[in-house]
């Protein structure tokens, strides 16, 4: 697409207040596209002049209709419940990920928006089983096989998005073309979700062990994911013969890497020691299961942050990686090489890193003691067999 064509475009990015949505918006703005960011919270970063931010909620159809009217493409990146304690807020996850996606599709139809690119996840296929060189021909994970509501709802949403491809727009003005990008774990300078949790664990002395049997996984640098989204939007146009319409694509940096070794440059670059202790996956999974069980009972009075959830244990401790040939062949996606060293340098330059103070490793000990005590109390409530 030429720069003059882009200058005539208006795009809306749901989830535009988040790390990826904001970065995608800035990149499109630099290419001359008129960008509107839509989110329930404002971006942490300064907005370049010319980018518009609209505060709103994907659970409101009327708000979505107002913001997407006149747009030529919507990037639906908004979601909830990817990690941490958010993963245990089941009703909110359902409302945002499923009903929010239904709303944005309906808003596009009602206001004649012809294209929608949906940001999906590996988790629509992966649920703890080993996958090597998977591709888009693999079936969705059965609904009763998910251990977390985020992955289940992202699957329901993706299925709906692809089903609504070629849906007729209002007043017979054309058709809605949709596609889905199944992204690997995102990383990059300033990433706001996963990397800060790892750094927080380092600061508290809680990153003491790894687990699993050489788990091979994939990641995607934010700039590569941005490139994939822009290419996907173009592949939904008549100029590209709508080649991406109704299609899912796996998106990553390419070759799989050991999940924990991938973060070694970050850990050591910030001055911490990389752990040498390795636990069995089953033991860590049981601990995560116990943590979730306790959270279920006491979250009304103490909505604590779990160290790990079951889905996170699977995601980080079980081998799963996918081919990106379809995205390369149909979208022209060619991931550029990036390293975690650059990311570590960014965090170091922004004040992160080991300080000249004693690491409070007893955080982990107290968390374990807390979980054990609550378990004892809960077990004491169970009826006896007598």
Swiss-Prot record:
Membrane topology note: Multi-pass membrane protein
An example molecular function term from Gene Ontology annotations: oxidoreductase activity, acting on the CH-OH group of donors, NAD or NADP as acceptor
Residues at the catalytic site: 150 (proton acceptor)
Enzyme Commission number(s): 1.1.1.-
GO biological process, one term: steroid biosynthetic process
UniProt keywords, alphabetically: Membrane, NAD, Oxidoreductase, Transmembrane, Transmembrane helix
Superkingdom of origin organism: Eukaryota
Binding site for NAD(+): 154
Predominant subcellular localization, coarse grouping: membrane
GO cellular component: membrane
Pfam family membership, one: 3Beta_HSD
Transmembrane segments: 279-299, 363-383
Cellular location(s): Membrane
Top EC class of this enzyme: oxidoreductase
Family per record: Belongs to the 3-beta-HSD family.
PANTHER family tied to this protein: BIFUNCTIONAL POLYMYXIN RESISTANCE PROTEIN ARNA (PTHR43245), SHORT CHAIN DEHYDROGENASE_REDUCTASE FAMILY 42E, MEMBER 2 (PTHR43245:SF51)
Protein name: Short-chain dehydrogenase/reductase family 42E member 1
Species: Xenopus laevis (African clawed frog)
């Amino acid at each position: 697409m030429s720069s003059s064509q882009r200058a005539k475009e208006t795009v809306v990015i749901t989830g535009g207040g988040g790390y990826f949505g904001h970065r995608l918006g800035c990149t499109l703005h630099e290419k001359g596209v008129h960008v509107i960011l839509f989110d329930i919270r404002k971006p942490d970063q300064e907005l370049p002049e010319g980018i518009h931010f609209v505060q709103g909620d994907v659970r409101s159809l009327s708000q979505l209709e107002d913001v997407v009217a006149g747009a030529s493409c919507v990037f639906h990146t908004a979601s909830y419940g990817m990690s941490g304690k958010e993963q245990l807020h089941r009703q909110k996850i359902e409302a945002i990920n499923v009903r929010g996606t239904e709303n944005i599709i309906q808003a596009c139809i009602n206001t004649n928006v012809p294209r929608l690119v949906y940001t999906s996840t590996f988790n629509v296929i992966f649920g703890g089983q080993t996958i090597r060189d998977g591709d888009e021909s693999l079936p969705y994970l059965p609904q009763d096989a998910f251990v977390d509501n985020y992955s289940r709802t992202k699957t329901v949403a993706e299925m709906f998005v692809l089903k609504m491809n070629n849906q007729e727009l209002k007043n017979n003005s054309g058709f809605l073309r949709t596609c889905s990008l199944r992204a690997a774990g995102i990383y990059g300078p300033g990433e706001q979700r996963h990397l800060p949790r790892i750094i927080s664990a380092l600061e508290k002395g809680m990153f003491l062990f790894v687990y699993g049997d050489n788990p091979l996984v994939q990641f995607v640098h934010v700039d590569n994911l941005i490139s994939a989204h822009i290419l996907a939007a173009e592949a939904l146009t008549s100029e590209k013969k709508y080649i991406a319409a109704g299609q899912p694509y796996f998106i990553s940096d390419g070759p799989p890497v050991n999940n924990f070794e991938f973060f070694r440059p970050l850990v050591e670059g910030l001055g911490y020691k990389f752990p040498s202790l390795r636990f069995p996956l089953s033991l860590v999974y049981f601990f995560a299961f116990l943590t979730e069980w306790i959270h279920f009972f006491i979250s009304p009075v103490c909505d604590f942050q779990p160290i790990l959830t079951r889905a996170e244990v699977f995601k980080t401790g079980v081998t799963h990686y996918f081919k990106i040939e379809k995205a390369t062949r149909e979208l022209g996606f060619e991931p550029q090489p990036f390293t975690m060293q650059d990311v570590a340098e960014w965090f170091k330059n922004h004040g992160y890193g080991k300080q000249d103070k004693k690491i409070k490793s007893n955080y982990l000990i107290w968390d374990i003691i807390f979980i054990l005590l609550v378990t004892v109390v809960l077990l004491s409530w169970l009826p006896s067999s007598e």
